[in-house]
Design a protein with these regions (language model features):
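Binuclear metal-dependent phosphoesterase catalytic core
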Residues: 46-98
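His/acidic metal-ligating clusters that form di-metal
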Residues: 1-56, 89-94
């Protein structure tokens, strides 16, 4: 099981230079490494980027600056819950691990 933590998420090629430069430098290595999921922040808003959305071989969860992500990993899957300050679950994602 491989979980990557990166502050700045990758972008589709439009937008801020930093996102695109990190994508150019790191995405090929992470794709080759067999990453199961990548967790990010930086944008201060939630998003979930499916496999292939930014040439990625793994899903990317981007969390906001006001919520937390609870991650539970087993041999077969990674469960992620995005939870707000009141404890309400806003989003759930499960990634199967091979």
């Amino acid at each position: 099981m491989k979980i990557a933590l990166l502050h700045i998420p990758f972008d589709k090629g439009v937008g801020w230079y930093g996102n695109n430069e990190l994508k150019r430098l790191l995405l090929p290595t992470l794709n080759e490494a067999g990453i199961d999921v990548m967790l990010c922040g930086h944008t201060h808003r939630y998003s979930f980027r499916d496999v292939g959305s930014v040439d990625n071989n793994f899903p990317i969860l981007v969390n906001s600056n006001n919520d937390k992500v609870n991650v539970r990993a087993t041999k077969s899957q990674i469960d992620m819950e995005v939870v707000d300050a009141t404890g309400k679950v806003l989003h759930r994602h499960t990634v199967k691990v091979e």
